[in-house]
Every structure is written in C-alpha cells, then in structure tokens.
Regions:
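Short, Lys/Arg-enriched alpha-helical recognition elements, typified by the DNA-recognition helix
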Residues: 1-71, 80-83, 212-217
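Active-site/catalytic core of tyrosine-dependent DNA strand-transfer enzymes
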Residues: 5, 99-100, 143, 151-155, ...
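Short basic/aromatic active-site micro-motif
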Residues: 23, 58, 225-243
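Basic, Lys/Arg- and aromatic-enriched nucleic-acid-binding interface segment
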Residues: 41-44, 49-53, 57-59, 72-136, ...
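C-terminal catalytic core of tyrosine-transesterase DNA break-rejoin enzymes
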Residues: 72, 115, 119, 123-130, ...
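Short functional hotspots where side chains directly engage DNA or cofactors
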Residues: 82-83, 143-148, 198, 228, ...
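Catalytic-site neighborhood detector that most strongly recognizes the C-terminal catalytic loop/helix
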Residues: 88, 96, 152, 202, ...
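Conserved small/polar residues in nucleotide/adenosyl-binding loops
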Residues: 277-286
Length: 288
C-alpha cells in the first residue's frame, strides 16, 4: 500500500477531524485496532474485513513520521503514537515456484497472452511496478542491456509514472539471448512505446493491479500454487543463487539497497547452497 493510500484512505478519514493537540495515544491505539478488525476497503470476501498486521504497521510508520514532523516544528510537544502497541512484524512467507510449475505457468501464459511479461519477470526479478513501466527505448537489442529507470504506481487512485523508489532501483540488467529473441518477435506485434501497454489504451502502461489479477487466473488454470507477483521475483532470486550467482551480483540485478538486504531475505538459500557445496566437496575427498 502506497503512503498516499495510507493517508487518504485511512488516516485522514479516521483521525483527520481530531485536532493534533487533542490527539491521544488511546485515540491512535483505537484507530489501529479498528483497522485490524474492519479496515479493509476492497476484496473483503476474499481476504476478510480486517487489514493485515503488515499493512497496519505500514500505516503506523507513515503516521508516526508525520507526527514526528509536527513535534520537530513545535506544533505538538510529543508524539502520541510512540507508545502504541503494534501487531507483530511477521514477514509474509516467501513462496517459490518449482521448475515444473514455472514450465506449466509459461505454457498457460502463452495461451492467455501474458507469456512475454511473465518470461521477462522470471528472467530478471523486476518489481511489478517496474516491469509495467518498461518502454522499448529501455532495451538495447544489440547488447541485451535493459534499463530500469521508472515505476508505475497509483496516486489518489490514478496511475502515475515516477522514478524508482531508491537509487539502487535505478539499474541495468543484461537479458539472456533467448529472452531477447522472444521480445524481438513480440515487439513486431506491439504498436506502443510501452513494452507492456494497457489493453485499453496503447498510450498508457499496464496497470500493476491488472497484472496481479491476470497472474492469479493463469496460476489457477496452470494448476500451480497461488503465489503473489512478488513471489516470481523470489523465484528468480532463489534459482539464481542455487545456480551459482553471487549475492553481490544478484543484489544489483534485483535493485536491493545493499547486499546485506539480499542476504537477509535469502539467507535460507545461501545457507543451503553453502551446505550443498561443502557436502559435494566432502564427497569428492572421500573418493580420492
């Protein structure tokens, strides 16, 4: 959830009428409790009425920063959200598609007209907003270099295009020759500056939310487990590490701020890879 949605869909409607100097820790705690119980505005039948722990913590982060600003400008003497109890910071479980599931997914994606987008995602690990923001000018077919320099996201309900969220997100990725060939053939069918234009308007990028819905439908038809689009990014990263890519290179490709972030997210993969390498080395010694 973007910070604009946190502010305009949740914080202002619930706490906006209360003057800052009258806002108490209890008011904010009650607000967070309400979000957990019935704060979801969309897809209630699918996910329930309450927001997830992660989303509530994200709303707190945005609101706490705003109140800190009010303190620094001497509008209020202290931040009333400092002592609020927050839901536990449990990370959403990462899911990775198996090679067999990847094959089934791509076969089904060909039938559903989403093959090129999903193949590129599984070959690069781009974020959903980044892949939707790609233009043909970003890709050099001679060198295979793909520039990632913008993202698509929603601001006040409208699609917007902006620079990536961090300096590290602004990066280049080298595509494998087979992927380049697929994109070259695909380009002849697309009459748009956008690599993946909106089906409704060639002059606009594809809506990341529409891509998410499309993926869900394709996964179901392909008989694969239900995963998020972000899990395709995890799938790329996991397979890259398992096939010998070093963490520093992977960190650059997927746009992490530091290798420490990559190590933290994929520690289980690197640990398993190291253990496997040591085991094979030991087996080799035994056969000498």
């Amino acid at each position: 959830m973007s910070y604009e949605r946190r502010i305009y869909q949740h914080i202002i409607p619930n706490l906006g009428p209360t003057p800052l100097n009258k806002l108490t820790t209890g008011d904010i705690q009650q607000f967070y409790t309400g979000l957990k119980q019935n704060g979801r505005l969309l897809r209630q039948e699918q996910y329930g009425e309450g927001l997830s722990d992660q989303t509530v913590r994200g709303i707190h982060t945005t609101f706490h920063a705003a109140l800190d600003k009010a303190v620094s400008e001497k509008i209020i003497p202290k931040n009333p959200s400092d002592f609020c109890r927050l839901p536990s910071a449990k990370a959403r479980e990462m899911q990775v598609l198996s090679p067999e599931e990847i094959q089934r997914l791509l076969i089904q994606a060909k039938e559903d007209g989403c093959f090129e987008l999903l193949l590129l995602e599984l070959s690069t690990g781009l974020r959903r907003g980044e892949i939707c923001a790609l233009q043909w000018d970003d890709l050099n077919f001679n060198t295979g270099e793909l520039q990632v320099k913008r993202q698509v996201h929603r601001v006040k309900g409208e699609l917007a295009v902006s620079e990536p969220k961090t300096k590290a997100s602004n990066r280049s990725v080298i595509l494998p020759p087979p992927v380049l060939m697929v994109l070259s053939n695909y380009k002849t069918e697309i009459n748009s500056a956008w690599m993946f234009p909106s089906p409704l308007n060639n002059d606009s990028p594809r809506d990341p939310a529409a891509v998410r819905k499309r993926l869900t439908a394709i996964l179901e038809r392909a008989g694969c487990k239900r995963v998020r689009f972000h899990d395709l990014r995890h799938t790329f990263a996991t397979l890259a590490l398992e096939n010998g890519m070093d963490v520093k290179t992977l960190s650059t490709i997927i746009g992490h701020v530091s290798t420490a972030t990559t190590l933290n997210v994929y520690a289980h993969v690197t640990d398993e890879t190291v253990s496997y390498t040591h085991l094979r080395a030991h087996e080799t010694e035994l056969h000498l």
